[in-house]
C-alpha cells in the first residue's frame, strides 16, 4: 500500500473481543487484525503511515483500551466515541445493515462528518481510581442481587448465599481502602477530596468518583458542569410543539453516585433538604426535584473547587 499524507483522513475502528476491524476513509482501505499486542502493533504501524486527522473507536467498557494506549504511545490522535452518538448517526443516514466492516466504515464516516473532539488518556492514578469506583459499583450491584435472592430462597438454600454476601462485603471494604490510599498518595487529590467531602452528603466514594470521572470540575462553568453529568434539561421544541424538557447524555457513572449522595444530603444537609421540599411544594415530581437538587449540588461543588473553598451552608443557601 502506498503512503499518502492527507489531513482529512479519518479512521474508524470496530472493536471485538478477538478482532479489530479498521477502515480508513476516504482511501477505502479496510483491514482486520487480532485484538492482541501483535495485532494492535501492526494496526498502529499501518495507520500511522497515513497521518490521520482522527481515529475513532467506540467505548465498549475495556476492550478498546489496549488499542487506545497504543495510539497514545504512538502520538496518534484518537477519540473514544459514545456508542449512542454513533448509533444516532447511523439512524440519520438510514443505515440498518450491520456487519463488522460496515460498522468500521460508519465510525470513519462519523469521524469525518461530526469531527468529535479528541480524547485524552487519564493519568494512571486517575484511571486506577475510576476503575476502583467502577469495581465497587459492580460489587454493590451483585451484593444487592444476592440480598434479593436471600429473601425468596428456602432456608436450606439461604445458607449458600450468606457466605457470598460476606465475601462481597469484605471485597467492598478492600476496594474502599484502596481508594483512600490512592487519594492519600496524591496531594492534588487530597486537596480536592477535602473540599468535596466538606459538603454534607458527599462521602469518600462520591468524592473519588468526581475526582476520577469528572476531572474538569472546578475549571468549567455551571452549564458545562451540569451537562457533563447529564442533569442539564434539554429543550424539545419544533414549530408550535413544545415538549417536556428532559435530561440526557452525560457521564452516568458520576450521575449515579451523585444521585445516591443526594439521597443522603436531603436527609442531613439543610440546604438541599429545603430545596427539595420547596420544589415538591411547587408541584414538581419527586424525581425532577431530586435531579434539580443534584444540578444545584454540582454547580456548588464546581464553584468550591474553582475557588478552593470549603462548604459553608449560610453562604450558599440562596
For the regions a language model picked out, list residue spans one by one.
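Nucleic-acid-processing active sites and adjacent nucleic-acid-binding tracks
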Residues: 25-54
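Phosphate-backbone recognition surface of nucleic-acid-processing proteins
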Residues: 208-282, 286, 313, 318
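Basic, amphipathic alpha-helical segments enriched in Lys/Arg and hydrophobic/aromatic residues
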Residues: 281-318
